[in-house]
């Protein structure tokens, strides 16, 4: 029988704090990056992921690309997402630092776990 996974949420933010009890504090969720010029360097971007499903450990990949173009980065995470017994939720975050954005436009972040995907979006705009 194949394991079943549901990606419950994904957020793009500037920082994540993990409390001693494992709770996450997600700081400054955003969907737009502004820059004076391109290419631009965004100092830090976190992708926070929450998933539920069958208990186990799962490989996670995160890809960032400008819509309609090749990926600017893809990470297969060295640490697997651990999903504990129901009703607990697996949580994981990925840090991209620095993130080079070559041009203004619409970008998508694709999160993949066991064939399940979730897309997040952000705009890069010139100010």
What is each PLM-predicted segment?
Residues 3-104, 108-127:
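Contiguous segments within soluble domain cores/interaction surfaces
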């Amino acid at each position: 029988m194949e394991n079943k996974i549901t990606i419950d949420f994904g957020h793009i933010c500037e920082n994540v704090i993990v409390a001693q009890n494992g709770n996450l504090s997600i700081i400054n969720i955003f969907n737009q990056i502004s820059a004076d010029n391109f290419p631009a360097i965004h100092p830090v971007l976190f992708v926070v992921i929450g998933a539920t499903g069958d208990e186990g450990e799962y490989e996670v990949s995160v890809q960032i690309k400008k819509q309609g173009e090749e990926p600017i980065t893809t990470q297969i995470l060295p640490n697997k997402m651990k999903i504990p017994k129901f009703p607990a939720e697996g949580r994981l975050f990925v840090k991209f630092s620095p993130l080079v954005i070559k041009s203004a436009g619409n970008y998508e972040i694709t999160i993949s776990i066991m064939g399940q995907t979730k897309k997040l979006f952000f705009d890069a705009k010139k100010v």
